[in-house]
Amino acid sequence: TAAVHPGENTLTVQVYRFCSGSWLEDQDFWRMSGLFRSVELFTKPELHLEDVFVKQSFAEDFSSATVTFDCKVSGAGTVSVVFNGQEQSAEVGEPAEYDSGVVFGKGEADPDVEEDVQDVSFTFTVEHPALWSAEQPNLYEAEIALLNEGALVERTGMKVGLRKFELKDRQMLLNGKRIVFKGVNRHEWSCRTGRTVSREEMLWDVKNLKAHNVNAVRTSHYPDDPYFLQLCDEYGLYVIGETNLETHGTWQKLGADGSDEWTLPGARPEWRENVLARAEAMLERDKNHPAILIWSCGNESHGGKTLWEMSEYFRNTDPSRLVHYEGIFWNREYP
């Protein structure tokens, strides 16, 4: 990059309090500006793990689990995955197919990456899996390593919770057993530092929720800090991950004159990309957290085609979770 030079460099960040997207952020909280969470600037090697999506399926009696790591890798080299005492590897760079549960193929080029992004999947079988739940938040460890001619280039560690969540006969089932949410809405707020919440305060929240027999949290009304979700994985809290969308101020005129001209996002094409991008950003960041059982389209943003498209995006991209939306009323255009 031409943006930095040898020696010391100055990085200047300009933060805007409001932007056009602020019309989609009408949540009920104090309006503050600034950086509330950690910000990272990093470089990546030519051989790089761009993404991983952990997918699961189970025997009917949960006596075994099939766990697949769908990886996207840029560059050429060796990809190695270690999970549950098993190791699998594959060479990336040329389309091929491998035995032992490894399938490899060339994906579409990512416009944000110079190299083509290639898809490679690793499938493992776990006998008698230790399942994840709020009562027993069992976690497995996985490690993905990228090597160039045997030399380690990059290593990624992650924790994997094995669980199956479904809606069956009008009941929510986790690992085949009915569960009931005893939950709360949670805003990110500190009595001491406002919108910036420390890790110690997040841990305090989680421990106190557990101590008071709360088993579920809705991240009202935006995706929470990744560290909070990590704590929910480790301590055992069910999470409704909510998209950063609330526009109740734009449709309050409906009660006065019945007009729909102010309502956002509705079916307005100029807002579609912005709204769906928020849903995608949340899902792609948080999709491997076992604690998240439900994706939420947002809060109090009326109805319309765009919200329906968001719900369909969640269902089609991640059928392992349910989809929620709290919109005050039932939009009868979409039964």
Which residues does each PLM region occupy?
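Short Asp/Glu-rich motifs
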Residues: C191, F228-L229, T250-Q252, E333-Y334
